[in-house]
Amino acid sequence: MTRAIVESIKKRFHELDPCTNSNYSKFKVIHTDLTLTVSFESKTLDGTVVYDLKNLDNASEVILDTSALNIKSTKVNGKEVSFELKPVTPIYGAPLRIPINPNESEIQVEISFTTTDKCTAIQFIQGDTGPYVFSQCEAIHARSLFPCFDTPAVKSPYKFTGHSPAVVTMSGRAQPTDEPNTYHFDQPIPIPSYLVSITSGNLLKAPIGPRSDVYSEEPSLKKCQWEFEKDMENFIQIAEKIVFEYEWSRFDSLVLPSSFPYGGMEIPNMTQLTPTLISGDRTQTKVMAHELAHSWSGNLVTNSSWEHFWLNEGWTVYLERRIIGAIAAAEAKEEGRKDAEKYGEQVRHFNMINGWNELADTCETFDKRYTKLVLDLENGDPDDSFSRIPYEKGFFFLYHLETKLGGIKEFDPFIKYYFNKFKYQSLNTAQFVDTLYEFYEPKGKAEILDNIDWETWLFVSGLPEKPEFDVTLANQVYALVDKWVAYVKNGGELPGDETADFEGEQDMLFLETLTEKFKTLDVKPEIIRLFPEIYPKYGASKNGEIISRWNELLISYGKYSSQDKLVQSFASWLGTIGRMKYVRPGYLLLRKGISHEFALEVFKKYEHIYHPICRTMVKKDLS
């Protein structure tokens, strides 16, 4: 039955990545050399990329992805050749066709190019201390930075060179150089195009561990250092125990300006982080655990196309929660708790509860096509499918497998086997399932796998079956929520502030559970307007997770107007951040809770600060 299951899964997705115009399957990329020169005056990058290729199929041309690039020249084996830039397609850009001799098995292709003002991968801004540029290539924006096989199916070792009057970081290990305004980097581990990155600005660094520095502009450096130095090395050591040794030499991180559209981006050797993590309370360090976990899941072992994005993110959330649970257990052990291991698992489950709530909310509000694990992205934009689905539904699928196969002790050996088997490679969902059988069939567990509902988990939209959670750490939260529900239904004594002992994750669970419960109740706005007085700590919080949930609760049920101070304050906050996790729901909240006109008015006021990816997605949300 094993082969039948795997073969049936194979038939449900595209054999080749549908989100690339390139003919990547005809070549193996031996090595890539990328040089980029930053011009802050023209807000462009001038570049040259050199590919050493092995022709696998007697191909007579190399077809690369480009988007809004100015192609200046192309060479094959050192000789200039003509090229053809095909018409632009709305999502996938313009294919670049370069003729080659089909009889030559190994060739070198060189392209000179310049980015344009339509580049979706880079953003030039004025930083805190001077001009600044950073890139963000996931999912298919690398093609607007340089001509490439823009698919996660293709991985290559790189050498990078950056020229700039300001400090440069790229996706590799810094190499010594005496050349002025020149920075060299080596990446010996093969990486896909979406992990290629360049940042340039007045950057300084501070140590946060024996193999880790944090980079940022000077005004925020000390705050960044404090936020991460307590946990960084512990995170790495625990991850190494779960998977295997960290292979990337150093794990450095870069806290970007506020317009960075994501929580973090797992750039090899230089993880990019949003400044919204610098909350002064270390409550959001799990994002660092998440980005670290990508060093194995996503970076070493990569999804072969964006249709299988869950293989990157589901695994990463799984490893992240294992790391967070292990850290909690270690701290409990230091405090002398006899139930330290049990407590660590309770912490993992508490994070799972928050994850389930996010998954349920996404399944309720998001495009149903994109609430499956394995997607159909033919003629589709991967950015449109970006949500919590691959993260949380992917996690719960892996947790389901862990549970069915016998728990952590039975699943941990598979983790090491899987990541060892596929490191430096890209894979699809069928290969993952095949590897499960390969590992567990000799252990007599094939029947367990046969009974997994693969169809529902992989190809059906919506919420999967809810697992049983250890709610020990959530009970205190639920008790306070129940008091509010009873008060709204029956009146009586007004609940007070019983959140003083809540940890950050408990505060988040309280706010989102209350918001969810109130959907089915007739909550009077006057009650909601008492909340800022009862819970002043939420109104004063600098933590983006709290700010977003707090305002969702108040604006959803308080019947505020656009002129109310609370609404004006939230609208102003949206103009100080660029993280899409907060920005997109924030504008949808203003549209639903205040008015469409007000949401558009606020967006038009601040759209110039947002990254091109974020700007495009909010426009779609509000259209």
UniProtKB/Swiss-Prot annotation:
Keyword Metal-binding (UniProt): yes
InterPro entries assigned to the protein according to its UniProt record, in alphabetical order: Aminopeptidase_N-like_N, Aminopeptidase_N-like_N_sf, ARM-type_fold, LTA4H, LTA4H_cat, M1_LTA-4_hydro/amino_C_sf, M1_LTA4H, Peptidase_M1
GO biological process, one term: cytoplasm to vacuole targeting by the NVT pathway
CC annotations in GO: cytosol; fungal-type vacuole lumen; multivesicular body; nucleus; NVT complex
Enzyme Commission numbers on file: 3.4.11.-, 3.3.2.10
Primary location class: cytoplasm
Cofactor note as given: Binds 1 zinc ion per subunit.
Gene3D superfamilies named among the record's database cross-references: 3.30.2010.30, Neutral Protease Domain 2, Peptidase M1, leukotriene A4 hydrolase/aminopeptidase C-terminal domain, tricorn interacting facor f3 domain
Localisation: Cytoplasm; Nucleus
Residues annotated as catalytic: E291 (proton acceptor), Y391 (proton donor)
PANTHER family recorded: LEUKOTRIENE A-4 HYDROLASE (PTHR45726:SF3)
Family indicated by similarity: Belongs to the peptidase M1 family.
Name the UniProt record assigns to this protein: Leucine aminopeptidase 2
High-level lineage: Eukaryota, Fungi, Dikarya, Ascomycota, Saccharomycotina
